[in-house]
């Protein structure tokens, strides 16, 4: 397969249009391209394809850079930091495209087309009714200078079309899909410059990759059919052709590809919800790429384990359960101080000063998102609501049990082991029968972190008050032991 880079000079890129907030599909495509570059010690660049001016307000550009950085992707060249092959915003490169248009026109490989949208629609309708695939029939291919001048004088603004060779087959290698063959006669001459002077996607994208010395293009499968046209443009201009790999699109729950246009869940939404970038990286890196390591990997290990031949062709679906699995792993990979930094914006003022680290140590295995930690802070330091099964666990034991629980707690000076040992001896309860009602009364839940770690946070005073409140609930006498 054509592949002219060695791992030493590999250069890949992410080239989004700043037309909305990045979604997980964009993020995964960016991640694969970045992992390929970083894994090979190559170069990674960011280029903004902002030629759709109506849909590219500045807020999206800023958000895009911010989201990528948060996600953990860095770039060696880009709109914010420049580089040897800039500028990195396509709207700043119009003069560059102009030179290449002129070259194609003067060598006869591109020509002005004056057909109106109505003309083209009519042509397509005829082709369709004849059972043919619609393509440009070449009406303006052979206009002479006089005919062109006449149309210009009438005020018609032409598009510029690429002249596709009439015969032959183009072989397009793809790192994911293998080789595909295209009959050139089927392609039809295509627009490379719109009538308003703006570059067509195919053109600017292909020219920029070549001029920026990108030799590996990993992008979404939505661009698969653009590739033959792009290779034709590059060949006509004598520019190098990169290796292409098209990644299966990430689909939403409705089975449709995620798209900025249709408001797919964005990276920034997940960030706001408290998902960690490392969780998203581990999740997305494995979505359509096989790693032999099944555990949590840091960015360096993800890059080292990345291999183009491990990319799958199967479509991938966004799966919240998988994301939560990696979120759990990512939280556990942090040390206590880092967990606190992550929680602090939501928890400041909710955890008494000095108890931050013991609190983190106690609850960290039980939290996926900062909201979970907020709930545990309320259960430790506030007034926890009792869940229905906790009420059941509390009322399932006699009021005497609760009196003894209070007395033994006081006698043990708040020491968890001494307390529960004494209570076990006095009540005859052990194991779950002992700990479940205690947990229910102290936290309002029947599950959660180790009680031994929670008790010092709750403190003796609050614990006594909660045991006292438990004693005041009418018991459902199902047992006679204390
Ligand atoms: N659902 C998806 N799954 C994987 N990659 C995607 C998906 N959608 C887009 N991409 C890829 O993300 C990169 C950036 O694309 P682009 O900025 O055009 O995003 P988009 O979501 O297609 O936006 P729009 O809806 O504005 O077309 C491209 O390589 C594109 O192929
Ligand atoms: Zn025409």
Curated annotation (Swiss-Prot):
Instruction: Give the EC number(s) under which this enzyme is classified.
Output: 6.1.1.17
Motif window: 'KMSKS' region: 257-261
Motif 'HIGH' region mapped to chain: 16-26
Chain ranges passing through the membrane:
none
**What InterPro entries does this protein map onto?**
aa-tRNA-synth_I_cd-bd, aa-tRNA-synth_I_codon-bd_sub2, aa-tRNA-synth_I_CS, aa_tRNA-synth_I_cd-bd_sf, Glu-tRNA-ligase_bac/mito, Glu/Gln-tRNA-synth, Glu/Gln-tRNA-synth_Ib_cat-dom, GluQ/Sye
Quote a single Gene Ontology cellular component term: cytosol
The UniProt family comment states: Belongs to the class-I aminoacyl-tRNA synthetase family. Glutamate--tRNA ligase type 1 subfamily.
UniProt xrefs under PANTHER family: GLUTAMATE--TRNA LIGASE (PTHR43311), GLUTAMATE--TRNA LIGASE, MITOCHONDRIAL-RELATED (PTHR43311:SF2)
**Under which name does UniProt file this protein?**
Glutamate--tRNA ligase 2
Gene behind the chain: gltX2
């Amino acid at each position: 397969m054509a592949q002219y880079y060695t791992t030493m000079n590999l250069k890949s890129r992410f080239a989004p249009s700043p037309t909305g907030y990045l979604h997980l599909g964009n993020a995964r495509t960016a991640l694969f391209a970045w992992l390929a570059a970083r894994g090979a010690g190559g170069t990674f660049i960011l280029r903004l394809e902002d030629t759709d001016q109506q849909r590219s307000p500045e807020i999206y550009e800023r958000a895009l850079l911010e989201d990528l950085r948060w996600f953990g992707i860095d770039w060696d060249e880009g709109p914010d930091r420049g580089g040897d092959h800039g500028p990195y915003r396509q709207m700043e490169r119009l003069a560059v495209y102009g030179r290449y248009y002129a070259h194609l026109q003067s060598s006869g490989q591109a020509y002005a087309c004056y057909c109106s949208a109505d003309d083209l629609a009519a042509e397509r309708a005829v082709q369709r009714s004849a059972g043919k695939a619609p393509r440009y029939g070449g009406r303006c291919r052979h206009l002479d200078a006089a005919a062109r001048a006449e149309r210009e004088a009438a005020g018609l603004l032409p598009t510029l079309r690429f002249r596709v060779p009439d015969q032959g087959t183009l072989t397009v290698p793809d790192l994911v899909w293998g080789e595909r063959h295209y009959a050139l006669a089927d392609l039809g001459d295509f627009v490379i410059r719109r009538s308003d002077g703006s570059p067509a996607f195919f053109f600017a994208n292909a020219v920029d990759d070549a001029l920026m010395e990108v030799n590996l293009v990993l992008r979404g499968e939505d661009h698969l059919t653009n590739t033959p046209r792009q290779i034709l443009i590059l060949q006509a201009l004598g520019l190098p052709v990169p290796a292409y790999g098209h990644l299966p699109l990430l689909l939403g729950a409705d089975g449709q590809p995620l798209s900025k246009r249709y408001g797919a869940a964005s990276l920034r939404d997940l960030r706001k919800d408290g998902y960690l970038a490392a969780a998203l990286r581990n999740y997305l890196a494995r979505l359509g790429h096989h790693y032999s390591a099944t555990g949590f990997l840091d960015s360096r290990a993800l890059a080292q384990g990345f291999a183009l031949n491990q990319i799958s062709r199967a479509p991938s679906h966004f799966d919240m359960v998988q994301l939560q699995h990696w979120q759990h792993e990512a939280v556990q990979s942090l040390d206590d101080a880092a967990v606190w930094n992550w929680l602090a914006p939501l928890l400041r003022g909710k955890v008494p000063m000095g108890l931050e680290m013991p609190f983190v140590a106690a609850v960290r295995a039980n939290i996926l998102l900062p909201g979970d930690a907020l709930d545990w802070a309320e259960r430790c330091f506030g007034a926890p609501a009792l869940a229905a099964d906790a009420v059941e666990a509390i009322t399932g034991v006699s009021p005497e049990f609760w009196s003894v629980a209070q007395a033994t707690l006081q006698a043990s000076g708040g020491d968890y082991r001494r307390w529960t040992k004494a209570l076990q001896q006095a009540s005859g309860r052990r194991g779950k029968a002992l700990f479940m009602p205690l947990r229910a009364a102290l936290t309002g839940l029947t599950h959660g972190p180790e009680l031994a770690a929670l008790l010092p946070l709750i403190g003796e005073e609050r614990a006594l008050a909660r045991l006292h409140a438990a004693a005041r609930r009418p018991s459902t006498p199902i047992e006679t032991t204390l």
